[in-house]
Amino acid sequence: MAGMNVKDTGVKQNTEMQAIGLNFERWQDAVEAAIASDRLAVTGEVRGGQLIQFTDPSGAQLNILAVEPFATFIGFNAVTQGFAHVEMVNDVLALLEIIDPFGTTIAQATANLAQGPLLADEPLQQWQQISLTAVGLDVRTYESAAAYEAAEGEFPALFESAGAKVISSGSGAEVPTPAATFAARVMESESRTNELTGEKFAHLVMDGLFPFDLCLPAGGNELPAKDSIVAGTALLTASIEMPSGGCGDGAGCGCGSGGCGCGGH
């Protein structure tokens, strides 16, 4: 499945975790540290189990689906906002039709959705207010838009979702993932420290085909400067900005205008 299952590996190869300062060798180590932190909150009830979220003051998040198919996947408390029609592919992966305020489609992308397990059995959710964070896997920086255009031959407003292409092709030969390729301009950049681990990471606000947050491992490098271009590959995460109040059943899922379909959870 698209969610990152708890893995038992002996080496630090979880680049996506390191990009938000969760510098653990194993997913299980991250889960155990999150549980011990006393910063867990129940997002909602799912098929007799729970969807639990750990949120670090740095914005780093860990979502834990404590019922079959049991998944652990990262997220981030992003500052950028947008709108999308949201349709779940499985318990974790969502197909997003990212739209502008007039309803015009900007892009289609697949992302690991923080509330995904709550919506897995629900129909298409239209006009959802969402936040998007790209977790950098392999990126490079260009001094300016002109430098990017000179090197790549195109304007730096790229966002291509491999998972969305797989879904639109209708081919069952490939499994969609939240992987994406992007190029965008840096609007803001700052260093943050994950309190759970003490590890630093870079948090950027990006202006590209649509606005999104970008998190990168610190790596001892200088922060990308404002108006520089960052491009490369990433894992896309998303969160629905749900209205307060919820459904009154502890599900933690808002049912306001266009709500997120809390029935049956």
Question: What annotation goes with each model-predicted range?
Answer:
Residues 111, 214-216:
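Generic detection of short hydrophobic beta-strand segments and adjacent strand-loop junctions
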Residues 129, 181, 201-203, 211, ...:
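Broad gene-expression machinery/nucleic-acid interaction feature
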Residues 186-214:
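OB-fold (S1/OB) nucleic-acid-binding surfaces
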Residues 217-233:
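Short nucleic-acid-contacting surface segments enriched for D/E, G, S/T with interspersed K/R
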Residues 236:
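Flexible, active-site-proximal loop/turn residues at the rims of small-molecule/cofactor binding pockets
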